[in-house]
Amino acid sequence: MAAFTAGSSPQAGKGRILIVDDEEGMRDLLRAILESDYHISEAGDGAALHKALEHEQPNVVLLDMKLPDANGLGLLSAIKQRWPATEVIMLSGAPTDSGAASWTAEAVKGGAFGFLSKSAEFSFPTVLACVSSALEQAQANSAALLGG
């Protein structure tokens, strides 16, 4: 079981991003891309994700579709039930032409904000833009839930 690790205390105005991926290298890469702009926490499996959700409400979760102990779609549902304002971006190492379209559609239907492929088109600007858009939506969701 991978441990949950929290980043430094969130600074005012920084969004809280939770990276959930069983590949340490992918978590390291995403942290490197995002840590200058966001408060980053990490989880390496489904159990660590559940533990993380007990301690904090992330604004955005980057969630791998395939974890050793959990299905990404099931985790998506758990996240949205626990923290409805949180936006979830699904991650997959599967090529986009290998049947990923069907589970991508299921993820969007289940409340996912978006999808990032961990393939060759994976780029820093794409990750930053997707997370920024998801954070804006999460903040709007929070305001709506608070009645404002």
Give the location of each predicted region.
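Short amphipathic alpha-helix used as the core "switch/output" element in two-component signaling
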Residues: 51, 73-85, 106
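Active-site residues of response regulator receiver
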Residues: 64, 92
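Two-component/phosphorelay signaling modules centered on CheY-like receiver
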Residues: 24-41
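Acidic catalytic/metal-coordinating carboxylates
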Residues: 45, 71-74
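Non-catalytic signal-transmission and effector/linker regions of two-component phosphorelay proteins
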Residues: 1-18, 125-148
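Alpha4 helix (beta4-alpha4-beta5 surface) of REC/receiver domains from two-component response regulators
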Residues: 74, 95-129
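Acidic, metal-coordinating helix/loop segments flanking the phosphotransfer/catalytic sites
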Residues: 42-60
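Residue-level signal for the "D+5" position in two-component response regulator receiver
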Residues: 42, 67-70
